[in-house]
Structure formats: structure tokens, C-alpha cells
Amino acid sequence: MARGIFITATGTDIGKTYVTALIIKRLRETNINCGYYKAALSGAERRDGKLIAGDANYVYNIANIKGDPNDAVSYIFQQAVSPHLAAKLNNVEISMERIKKDFYSIKNKYDYITVEGSGGIVCPISTGKEKIMLDNIIKIFKLPAIVVADAGLGTINSTILTLQYMKEKNISVKMILLNNYNHEDIIHIENKRYLSDNLLIPVYTCNKNANKLEIPVEKLIEIYEEI
């Protein structure tokens, strides 16, 4: 049976895709068969008449995953807006049935599956015939989560608000990862200390422009759960 984790963040452009790629890369470098999936992607590039799922393409390149990155994403939109709005603009009905079908197809190819969210944790995926929020996807696949947060000013507030929402939705958070961390920045140091001291969740860091995570592989493996 495969094991999975969901990667979400405290907001947009926090570094979810970057961290997701480094996690998968770390596992694959130790011969762990880890794959990637994303339900909906906005802001895709168009090349030679074809939309390119940029996030998936980045992850595949960094983590050395073979195959077409577009196959790892159920819905790909060019407009850089929330998935529900992109679907409206393109007259597309987003279906949980398709998301489930694609997810299980990817899951069956790997021993570990890393699922990346869209934007922050409160993200409408569909407001059409089916009302789908990001947390619905996390819960239907029974995935635990990693929360990616920026290491800088304001992260205590945004991280705790994100965790409170996830607690209300009964989503298990296994790790907080502070991105763009600078070991000489007093704000970053204090944010890590405060969150570590006041939350019952492990807090790790990822240095800015790092090409690998310093988190032990054993710790990463522990947070993936059977799905």
C-alpha cells in the first residue's frame, strides 16, 4: 500500500512547489519510489499551442521523475487566478470523480505520493456544480499534511491561523517547514523558536536557494501515512 503526504502553505508564493520538489528529490535520491500529484494548477505557460503545468514540470526536473509532468495534474489553466475562477473563465466543470481517478492512477505507480495544494489552505477548487474546497481533497484521500510558511515577519500569525483552520477541518499536520530561512536573521531565529516552543508539531527550516533539504530522510519517511 502506498504512503502519502499533502503539502500546503500559509499563502500563495510561499514556496510550496520548491519545497515539494526538494522533499521528493530527497526521497528519490535514497531509492524511494516517490511521485507527485496536483489537482488543479493555474498560471500555466503555453508552448507550441500546449499548456505546460509549470509547477509539475519544475518538480519533475528537480526530483528527476520520468514521464510527462502534465499527467500529474488533473486541471491545467493558463490564467494565474484561483482554480475555481480559472475554471469559470474556461467554462470547465471540475469534478471530484476525475480528481480521484487521476490521483489513484498516479498513486498506483509509486510507493510514496506527494500531493501539492493550490495557494494556501483555504482555496476554492470548484464553485460550479460541485463545490470543492482544497480541504475536501485532503480529507477524501485521508492525507496528513506539511505546512510551508515563510520564515520572515508575520509568519507566527499566518502559521497559527492556518493550523487553527486545519484543526477545525480535522486535518493532521505532521510538520511545519519555514522556507527562505536565514540562520543569521534574528526574526527568523525567533519565529522558529516561538513556533517550536508553542506548538506540538516539529518545525524545520529550508535555507533560501537551497538545492537540498537538511531534514533526515528517516524523519520524512515517518510523516508519510498509508493511504
UniProtKB/Swiss-Prot annotation:
Pathway(s) of this molecule: Cofactor biosynthesis; biotin biosynthesis; biotin from 7,8-diaminononanoate: step 1/2
EC number: 6.3.3.3
Source domain of life: Bacteria
Residues engaged in binding Mg(2+): 17, 55, 116
Essential cofactor(s): Mg(2+)
Main subcellular location: cytoplasm
Keywords annotated in UniProt: ATP-binding, Biotin biosynthesis, Cytoplasm, Ligase, Magnesium, Metal-binding, Nucleotide-binding
Annotated ATP binding sites: 13-18, 55, 116-119, 179-180
Enzyme class: ligase
GO MF terms, alphabetically ordered: ATP binding; dethiobiotin synthase activity; magnesium ion binding
InterPro entries: DTB_synth_BioD, P-loop_NTPase
One of the GO biological process terms: biotin biosynthetic process
Binding annotation for substrate: 42
Reactions listed under catalytic activity: (7R,8S)-7,8-diammoniononanoate + CO2 + ATP = (4R,5S)-dethiobiotin + ADP + phosphate + 3 H(+)
Keyword DNA damage: no
Localization of this protein: Cytoplasm
Active site as annotated: 38
Pfam families linked: AAA_26 (PF13500)
A cellular component annotation (GO) from this entry: cytosol
Listed NCBIfam families: bioD
Family, per entry: Belongs to the dethiobiotin synthetase family.
Subunit structure, as described in the record: Homodimer.
Its biological purpose: Catalyzes a mechanistically unusual reaction, the ATP-dependent insertion of CO2 between the N7 and N8 nitrogen atoms of 7,8-diaminopelargonic acid (DAPA, also called 7,8-diammoniononanoate) to form a ureido ring.
The protein's name: ATP-dependent dethiobiotin synthetase BioD
Taxonomic lineage: Bacteria, Bacillati, Bacillota, Clostridia, Eubacteriales
